[in-house]
């Protein structure tokens, strides 16, 4: 998902997106722990997406 698409979403949609990313990160971490994860770069990509969504949530709330 590109940055502009994320910026167009409201706070509720960003929270839903964040929840999905946390689930994806959890699944990837479990695969890595069990030795089944072949594409380890996906962990970093998901972590960066989480940071991007959290940044947008902070910008939207103005805290």
UniProtKB/Swiss-Prot annotation:
Protein keywords: Ribonucleoprotein, Ribosomal protein
Pfam families with a match to the protein in the record: Ribosomal_L29 (PF00831)
First and last residue of the signal peptide: none
A GO cellular-component term linked to this record: cytosolic large ribosomal subunit
SUPFAM superfamilies assigned to the protein according to its UniProt record, in alphabetical order: Ribosomal protein L29 (L29p)
InterPro entries: Ribosomal_protein_uL29 (IPR050063), Ribosomal_uL29 (IPR001854), Ribosomal_uL29_sf (IPR036049)
Any one biological process term the GO annotation gives: translation
GO MF entries: structural constituent of ribosome
Annotated family: Belongs to the universal ribosomal protein uL29 family.
Protein name: Large ribosomal subunit protein uL29
């Amino acid at each position: 998902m590109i940055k502009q698409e994320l910026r167009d979403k409201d706070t509720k949609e960003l929270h839903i997106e964040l929840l999905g990313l946390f689930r994806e990160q959890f699944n990837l971490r479990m695969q890595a722990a069990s030795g089944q994860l072949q594409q380890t770069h996906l962990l970093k990509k998901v972590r960066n997406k989480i940071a991007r969504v959290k940044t947008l949530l902070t910008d939207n709330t103005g805290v």
